[in-house]
């Protein structure tokens, strides 16, 4: 009995040791696998706006689709800071609003930025929102009034400058412009009556939703049809954009305005193979990304091709993947 009991205890001890070894071995393997994931930094913008929400959705989607990658979003001051951070190699990827990308890639008002396009994000229709109980119904009604034009480093402020210029207005002289530290600070100014309107863009933009869902509701103000044509004639790089009815609470009619496409840009030295893997993950998980964030349904390979100012601005690694899809020659 003593010998049998000793053997039994020895067998149990051996089994327990084996289980522990297996457990810790698997833990080490998992830890090692996590450590081996390639980290990719992604610059977004200030908290409270659309870029951080979009960046988080993109990062989670890519990381889930390609476990060898670890895309890590980082709050920044927005498009105006993201471009120089990419140029300095301090970010791998960054979200850049359309007008900021246009100026940077074409060297308007600054040296030309030597960067690549990874993907088109979504179209940003430029609009004002006011409280539904306010007397303001046109852009002219807002002249001389305090208007929130977004965070100081946001590309949306640049979009406002181009749109208003096309109407013969000056953003900084014809209005009382308010620029913010954080995009999320804008809605309270309108809701509390300290600002007449909030300028912004894109369907699902959190500050627009905050005003539209406020106690008084919201009303959008856009250029009229003649104004849209004036803007497009003055600044042809802008595009006509329609916001479908029902895109926001209380919005019962389509809104026809102008805007531009925002982009995910990359540093110039991002390896071709890495850009290829990122583009592939985005394409393969397009439906997953759309479910995470409905506005990201526009993050599609076809839109990248259509929205890029020139095809040679698309990263060579992305171009290789698009050729494999049969979308580029």
Tell where the protein language model's regions lie, with residue ranges.
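Conserved N-terminal glycine/acidic-rich loop preference
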Residues: 35-40, 50-57, 82-100
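Short beta-strand-centered segments that line the small-molecule binding cleft or hinge
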Residues: 113-122
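An extracytoplasmic/periplasmic, membrane-proximal ligand-sensing/linker region
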Residues: 185, 192-193, 202-220, 230-237, ...
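Pocket-lining segment of extracytoplasmic ligand-binding domains
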Residues: 98-100, 108-109, 134, 171-270
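Bilobed "Venus flytrap"/periplasmic-binding protein-like clamshell domains
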Residues: 39-65, 69-70, 124-192, 308, ...
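Short, solvent-exposed loop/turn segments at the edges of secondary structure
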Residues: 121-125, 258-259
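N-terminal hydrophobic or amphipathic helices and topogenic motifs
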Residues: 2-72, 113, 287-329
């Amino acid at each position: 009995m003593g010998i049998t009991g000793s053997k039994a205890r020895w067998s149990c001890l051996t089994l327990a040791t084996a289980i522990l070894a297996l457990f810790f071995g698997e833990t080490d393997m998992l830890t090692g696998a996590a450590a081996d994931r390639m980290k990719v930094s992604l610059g977004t913008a200030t908290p409270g706006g659309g870029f951080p929400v979009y960046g988080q959705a993109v990062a989670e989607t890519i990381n889930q689709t390609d476990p060898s990658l670890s895309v890590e979003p980082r709050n920044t001051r927005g498009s105006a800071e993201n471009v120089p951070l990419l140029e300095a190699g301090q970010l791998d990827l960054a979200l850049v609003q359309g007008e900021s990308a246009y100026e940077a890639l074409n060297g308007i008002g600054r040296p030309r930025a030597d960067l690549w396009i990874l993907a088109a994000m979504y179209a940003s229709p430029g609009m004002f929102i006011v409280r539904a109980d306010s007397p303001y119904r046109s852009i002219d009604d807002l002249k001389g009034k305090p208007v929130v034009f977004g965070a100081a480093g946001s590309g949306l402020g640049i979009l406002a400058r181009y749109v208003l210029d096309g109407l013969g207005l000056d953003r900084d002289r014809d209005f009382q412009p308010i620029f913010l530290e954080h995009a999320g600070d804008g809605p309270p100014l309108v809701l509390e009556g300290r600002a007449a309107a909030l300028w912004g863009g894109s369907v699902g933009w959190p500050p627009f939703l905050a005003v539209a869902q406020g106690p008084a509701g919201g009303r959008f103000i856009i250029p009229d049809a003649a104004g849209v044509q004036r803007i497009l004639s003055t600044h042809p790089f802008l595009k006509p954009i329609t916001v479908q009815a029902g895109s926001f609470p209380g919005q019962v009619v389509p809104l026809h305005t102008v805007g531009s496409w925002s982009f995910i840009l990359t540093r110039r030295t991002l390896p071709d193979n890495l850009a290829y893997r990122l583009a592939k993950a985005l394409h393969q998980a397009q439906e997953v990304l759309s479910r995470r964030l409905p506005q990201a349904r526009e993050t599609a390979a076809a839109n990248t091709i259509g929205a890029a100012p020139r095809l040679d601005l698309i990263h060579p690694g992305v171009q290789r993947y698009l050729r494999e899809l049969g979308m580029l020659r």
